[in-house]
Design a protein with these regions (language model features):
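Active-site beta-loop-alpha junctions enriched in small/polar residues
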Residues: 6-10, 31-35, 67-70, 108-110, ...
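Active-site acidic/histidine proton-transfer and metal-coordination neighborhood
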Residues: 73-171
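A general structural detector for well-ordered alpha-helical segments in enzyme core domains, enriched
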Residues: 16-19, 47-54, 87-94, 118-129, ...
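Acidic (Asp/Glu)-rich catalytic clusters
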Residues: 18-25, 43-64, 91-99, 127-134, ...
């Protein structure tokens, strides 16, 4: 597992590598543009080359891009779907340029209609974005289970992948907090193992490409997407120890998206706390 954190690209893409290194990250996650604006940040071949050179010289082994929050691939609004497609395609092309492990996407939301039409619209946008980019994987994130959000269980994610063509570039991102507030008890090895078995059966672990590591500030099954710092939430140290040491997660980028002690995102202590829990968990599993 490559433990890391979400970091800023302020001042240029390559700066994210330095920030990740300062935090002790083995992987990083970035936004390819402001997450709350449609206007894309323009990068060119020189930016991509600088990023790759910085990464080659750093302890950071993997980078994941998170698509902007404004995207709703399932929207009935044609213009919103057009903007969503353009933004998602832009993210995938940047992923192509920097060699990203994937672009993480919140698939979208259904509003005031049956699930079927929303799923079909989302799948169409996803397929179009993949067609208009080269090789970067697109990773559908399991959402927190709130009614109306697509990807709120493994069945939905599997169906969405099938509707979008089941291509090899389509993958999965699991978030510890989202799973917990969905109602999946992932706080001990036995229960987590059953959840991973279900993910394998319904989606396939060959599609699991990255993880988000967050404690939960809301109770099990609450469907409330509220992240807490490592070991400070409802999952606690024991729960995250189990998640971080799951053998089938080995080798995956694992990004912290925690608030951090100063509410400015994860800091070095948060990253080190996650690494320590992983070591403790691996030791327990060997006993």
């Amino acid at each position: 597992m490559l433990v890391g954190a979400h970091v800023s690209t302020a001042g240029g893409l390559a700066n994210a590598i330095e920030r990740g290194g300062d935090l002790g990250c083995e992987s990083i996650q970035i936004f390819n543009q402001s997450p709350r604006m449609w206007r894309p940040t323009k990068y060119g071949p020189g930016d991509f080359a600088e990023f790759r050179m910085a990464m080659d010289a750093s302890p950071v082994e993997a980078v994941v891009i998170h698509a902007v929050y404004l995207i709703n691939c399932a929207s009935k609004d044609r213009e919103l779907r057009r903007k969503s497609l353009a933004s998602l395609t832009h993210a995938l092309r940047i992923g192509d340029g920097i060699g990203a492990s994937g672009v993480v996407l919140h698939p979208g939301a259904q509003k005031g209609e049956a699930l079927g039409p929303s799923m079909k619209r989302a799948a169409k946008v996803i397929a179009a974005a993949l067609d208009d980019s080269d090789r970067c994987p697109l990773l559908l994130e399991q959402t927190a289970g709130h009614k109306g959000l697509l990807g709120r269980d493994f069945d939905q994610t599997a169906e969405l992948i099938e509707l979008a063509g089941s291509g090899r570039r389509l993958g999965l991102c699991l978030d510890s907090c989202h799973l917990f507030v969905q109602g999946y008890d992932v706080t001990d090895e036995e229960h987590l193992g059953k959840v991973v078995d279900e993910a394998d059966e319904k989606v396939g672990l060959d599609r699991l490409r990255c993880l988000h590591v967050n404690d939960a500030a809301a109770p099990l099954g609450s469907c409330r997407d509220r992240h807490a710092n490592i070991g400070k939430g409802e999952m606690g140290r024991a729960g995250l120890r189990a998640f971080l040491s799951e053998p089938r997660f080995d080798g995956l980028p694992a990004t912290l998206e925690t608030p951090g002690p100063s509410r400015k995102g994860p800091d070095r202590k948060e990253v080190q706390a996650a690494k320590r829990l992983r070591r403790e968990g691996l030791e327990r599993r060997r006993q």
